[in-house]
């Protein structure tokens, strides 16, 4: 299948980025030069550059042009296991900060309620936290918990930064994950704002659950949204390797 010229421009620039023949801060060819080189209209050249900008590879400076964005070294993240995200990042030596964004009661959602093994009449709360490394937003964590199991969650939820730490305060000590599901999506306008990313930066969505090992109680249903350009994902099942 023939590749259209806009895609060819994108691919050629991406090859240079991957091969590191272009360096952060280096200026890209102008729309006019690209249009001339590939024998296309300026609009086609502009669309190619706009796509690269939306994907987070380049940035524009009004009146000066477009430049290659500096990228941070990807963070290696083990997606499963019994260690909290906070502990994983601290153990790896990263400067992690967490902002509690909300604690709200949700309407009935069959996926959430089934995962929590909650009754139809149960009150379920969603606690959202924004994760930042070196003050750069990298993930949104959403924890869904049943008030029947945590009667004070409406009062405590707005202050929670680590769910595992909260569970330990209540006497739960050892945790394991439920079935984990991975999917890919693109950010909504709200997620773009929170994660400081463009509309075409793919997001990795991890849906899982947390179970107390001793009692086998389902403590929470978890939905985590990661910026795909900030992590390398370790999916090895044996975390003690």
Model-derived segments and spans:
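Beta-hairpin "wing" of winged helix-turn-helix
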Residues: 54-63, 69
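Conserved segment of winged-helix/HTH DNA-binding domains
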Residues: 71-99, 231-236, 240-241
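Alpha-helix C-terminal capping/helix-coil junction sites
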Residues: 17-18, 53, 168
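Short, hydrophobic-biased segments on the C-terminal half of alpha helices
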Residues: 49-50
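C-terminal all-alpha effector/ligand-binding and dimerization domain
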Residues: 97-241
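Extreme N-terminal segment that seeds HTH/winged-HTH DNA-binding domains in transcriptional regulators
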Residues: 1-42
């Amino acid at each position: 299948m023939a590749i259209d010229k806009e895609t060819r421009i994108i691919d050629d620039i991406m090859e240079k980025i991957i091969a590191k023949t272009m360096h952060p801060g280096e200026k890209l060819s102008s729309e006019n030069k690209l249009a001339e080189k590939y024998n296309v209209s300026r609009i086609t050249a502009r669309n190619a550059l706009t796509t690269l900008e939306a994907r987070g590879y380049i940035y524009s400076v009004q009146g000066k042009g477009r430049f290659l964005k500096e990228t941070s070294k990807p963070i290696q993240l083990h997606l499963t296991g019994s260690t909290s995200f906070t502990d994983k990042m601290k153990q790896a030596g990263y400067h992690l900060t967490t902002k509690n964004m909300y604690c709200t009661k949700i309407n009935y959602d069959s996926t959430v309620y089934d995962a929590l093994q909650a009754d139809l009449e149960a009150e379920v709360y969603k606690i959202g936290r924004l994760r930042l490394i070196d003050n750069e937003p990298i993930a949104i964590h959403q924890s869904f918990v049943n008030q029947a199991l945590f009667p004070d969650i409406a009062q405590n939820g707005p202050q929670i930064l680590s769910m595992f730490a909260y569970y330990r305060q209540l006497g739960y000590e050892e945790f394991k994950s439920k079935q984990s599901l991975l999917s890919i999506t693109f950010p909504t306008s709200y997620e773009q704002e929170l994660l400081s990313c463009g509309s075409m930066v793919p997001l990795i969505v991890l849906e899982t659950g947390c179970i107390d090992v001793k009692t086998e109680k389902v403590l929470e249903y978890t939905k985590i949204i990661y910026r795909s350009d900030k992590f390398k994902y370790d999916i090895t099942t044996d975390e003690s390797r």
